[in-house]
Amino acid sequence: MKAVILTKPTESTEVKIAEYPTPAVKPGWVLVRIKSFGMNHSEQILRKSEISAPYIQKPIIPGIECVGEIADASDTAFTAGQKVIAFMGGMGREFNGSYAEYALLPAHHVFAVDTNLSWDRLAAIPETYFTAWGSLFECLSLTSNDHLLVRGGTCALGYAAIQIAKALGCKVTATTHRESKMQLLTDCGADTALLDNDSLKGQVLGITKALELVGIKTLKDTLSCMEKGGIVCNTGNLGGVYT
C-alpha cells in the first residue's frame, strides 16, 4: 500500500509517499480501507518535533482520524464493506495511523456510521466535532443559558464549537486575530465577533463559559473575562506557547 512514513523530524516539503506493507489482521483489530481523513495540528507537531519522543512508535504512519470501509473484520462484529469512522486513542503515535491506503485499528476505536455524506465531508467530522462536544459538555457542562466565549474561533474546532453551542441555544462571542476572518465567525453563527489583540478584559461582559483555543498565551486574559463561577476549558494551543 501507499503511505506517509515518518522516522525523524520532517519539514512539510520533505514528506513523501512510499510503499509500505499492508498490515495483516489480528484478533480484536480491523483492517480499514481509508477513503479520506482530516488533518490536524497535532500531526504537524508530531512531524516537526514529537516524532523524537521515545513513546512514539518508529517508523510511524501519522494520522489520528479517518473514514472508510471495513476491508477485513477479523474476529469482530463488523462486516466487510461497512462504512466506519475512527479517531484518536493512539492512532498515528502508538500504532500506525491514517495517512495510508489501509489502517489496522483496534475495534473499540472504530464506529459504524449510516450516512450519505461524501467521504470528504464525512472526514471533516470525527476528531473535530468529538473534541468540540467533549470540551463543551464534558468539561464546560454547557447549557442554553450560558454565554460562551470561543477564543480562537476561526480554526476547525472553533467553528464546530460555535455551531454546537448555537444549536443548543447559547449566546456565543468568538474571536480571531485576523480582521479578514471576522465575517466567517458571524456566518458560522456567532452572535458577536471580536478582533483579538490578546487583551479582551473589559471588552466582553457576561461570559459564563469559555473555550480557550489560543492556549497559554491568552489563558490568563480569558480567565479575567469570566463571570463569578465561570469555567474555562483550555483545549487548543494556536498561540504556540507551551510554558
Language-model segments: what does each one mean?
Residues P21-G38, E50-M91:
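Glycine-rich beta-strand-centered segment in the early N-terminal region that forms part
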Residues K83, H147, K171, G230-I231:
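Short glycine-centered segments of the SAM/dcSAM-binding site in methyltransferase folds
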Residues I85, T208-L211, C233:
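N-terminal Rossmann-like NAD(P) cofactor-binding module of classical short-chain dehydrogenase/reductase
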Residues L185, K217-T243:
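Glycine-rich phosphate-binding loop and adjacent beta-alpha segment
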